[in-house]
Amino acid sequence: MLAIFAAASRARAGIEVTAPVALVAGDRQSDGIFPQWSIAQNIGIRSLARLRSGLLISPRREAELAGFWREKIGIRTLDMNNNIFSLSGGNQQKALFARALGSDARIVLMDDPMRGVDIGTKLEVYDLVREEARNGRTFLWYTTETEELDNCDHIHVFKNGRIVANLSRDELTEEKIIQSSFGDAA
């Protein structure tokens, strides 16, 4: 996932990305959050062009964006100016989703984004992802949790860096995933 995300910002043989891209990291501690920043700043960093007033970031615009996503995605905090670490892990992950969904990205890469997140948060985010997909956003979702595949239209099974199976949601079975992953399908 990180290689695809990196390809969006530079020319690379064989990969062409023609739309804005955002990443929702599963390992929020190392790849996702900015630990010294507020919740609002963590959400707004992907939307700087919209938040600027001249050369500076408009605190009002940043607060409006953060407030909108606090309500829409249900980030549980009284003050979006609190440090990101004041949130639970699930709410930190919601802030990362808010960063991606609040941006201009038409493609959202999700790198095992629900790892270690409670079931309530997962269900809320699944609903939001489906809503955004219906509105035209594309999601590329790497997951280690097979139940998350129910949220996908197409499933690609990878083995040794290559696609070994392309399944529609209707074709999806755990048996086909395991067979593709561990069989001689390469």
Identify the role of each PLM range.
Residues 1-186:
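Glycine-rich phosphate-binding loops of nucleotide-dependent enzymes
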